[in-house]
From Swiss-Prot:
The modification N6,N6,N6-trimethyllysine is found at K5, K28, K37, K80. It comes from Scheffersomyces stipitis (strain ATCC 58785 / CBS 6054 / NBRC 10063 / NRRL Y-11545). It comes from the Eukaryota. The modification N6,N6-dimethyllysine is found at K5, K15, K28, K37, K80. The modification N6-methyllysine is found at K5, K10, K19, K24, K28, K37, K80. The modification N6-acetyllysine is found at K10, K15, K19, K24, K28, K37, K57, K65. GO terms for molecular function: DNA binding; protein heterodimerization activity; structural constituent of chromatin. Phosphorylated to form H3S10ph. H3S10ph promotes subsequent H3K14ac formation and is required for transcriptional activation through TBP recruitment to the promoters. Mono-, di- and trimethylated by the COMPASS complex to form H3K4me1/2/3. H3K4me activates gene expression by regulating transcription elongation and plays a role in telomere length maintenance. H3K4me enrichment correlates with transcription levels, and occurs in a 5' to 3' gradient with H3K4me3 enrichment at the 5'-end of genes, shifting to H3K4me2 and then H3K4me1. Methylated by SET2 to form H3K36me. H3K36me represses gene expression. Methylated by DOT1 to form H3K79me. H3K79me is required for association of SIR proteins with telomeric regions and for telomeric silencing. Residues 1-42 are annotated as: Disordered. The modification Phosphoserine is found at S11. This is Histone H3.3. The nucleosome is a histone octamer containing two molecules each of H2A, H2B, H3 and H4 assembled in one H3-H4 heterotetramer and two H2A-H2B heterodimers. The octamer wraps approximately 147 bp of DNA. It holds the Pfam family Histone. Belongs to the histone H3 family.
């Protein structure tokens, strides 16, 4: 809606303003406590929605590379010691893992919404995996 210039209008009567109670007047006239400004806080959910939009726009990896690499090497130790990995192999593993997790969380969110909830729970992940046929 376009902004329009507002002109002063003559009062046409109406109700007269009531007198303020003593406590209300005292509250309004009291000075601000030491001029300390409260830190700004967004409403619950605002930051979460902003993060969702930010991460949906981006294409970079969400898991840090070195911790992921350590995890892969730790898991590989159980199968064979002294395994060596090309950096491109670890990169491909990380891409695949993140794509799988994002897809799983999308399905999990749909399960939570189907149950008329907005919070995902363990049972939503279990249901999503069961529907995919990953776990009987």
């Amino acid at each position: 809606m376009a902004r329009t210039k507002q002109t002063a209008r003559k009062s046409t009567g109406g109700k007269a303003p009531r007198k303020q109670l003593a406590s209300k007047a005292a509250r309004k006239s009291a000075p601000v406590s030491g001029g300390v400004k409260k830190p700004h806080r967004y409403k619950p959910g605002t930051v979460a929605l902003r993060e969702i939009r930010r991460f949906q726009k981006s294409t970079e990896l969400l898991i840090r590379k070195l911790p992921f690499q350590r995890l892969v090497r730790e898991i590989a130790q159980d199968f064979k010691s002294d395994l060596r990995f090309q950096s491109s192999a670890i990169g491909a593993l990380q891409e695949a893992v993140e794509a799988y997790l994002v897809s799983l969380f999308e399905d999990t969110n749909l399960c939570a919404i189907h149950a008329k909830r907005v919070t995902i729970q363990k049972k939503d992940i279990q249901l999503a995996r069961r529907l995919r046929g990953e776990r009987s």
